């Protein structure tokens, strides 16, 4: 600000010194001349300020995790091979399979439009697992409030996960899918240094996998059973239209649509009563 007033004073002094030789004879003409000099000076010193959009801000806040070994898992998956824990329940839902609506078969011949052909899922078929759980024995882990960027904003009550249902972008080549965080793994539930900080995934039975994705994510990105992807956290407002918005009682977009429909019905009912 001091720089601005000093510059303005110099401009006015320059303007007065030029007035004697200026072609502008009237005071009105001279005032216009002085203002023009001021505007030219401001253009030279005022910085160009870039105001980021909401989307750009969120991308800056949550950087991409690149080159992450990615494996496929599914709701109802039995234990076996390199999967030591069955996926009948999740870290946050003891009735995961029944709440989803059934077995989320990975068999491509038994799927259509990213969902099983045998039923309509009651939760989002685009889901993932990351190797961190913010809750243990019904309480938040000591580091949770310190390492989870959105902890304060998402907190609702003691021991209620602020990670469940969080949105991620998963990128393979020129395609990006969006999914919700619904389970913890692969293999670990304590690696916050990777999930929220800068460490790489730790070695494990699946080539150091650091991300599990559902059959829907696999199909959208064209992934192999074990592949490599990039991922990042995203805000709900930055999730674009796509098949990940279509299903699920846990899906923010489905919830918003239902609330809108309920409001329209209620408004129509209230209007009819007044007639």
Kindly label every feature range from the protein language model.
Residues 21-275:
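Secreted/periplasmic proteins
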Residues 1-4:
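Positively charged n-region of N-terminal signal peptides that target proteins for export
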Residues 16-20:
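Sec/Tat signal peptide C-region and signal peptidase I cleavage site
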Residues 6-15:
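Bacterial N-terminal signal peptides
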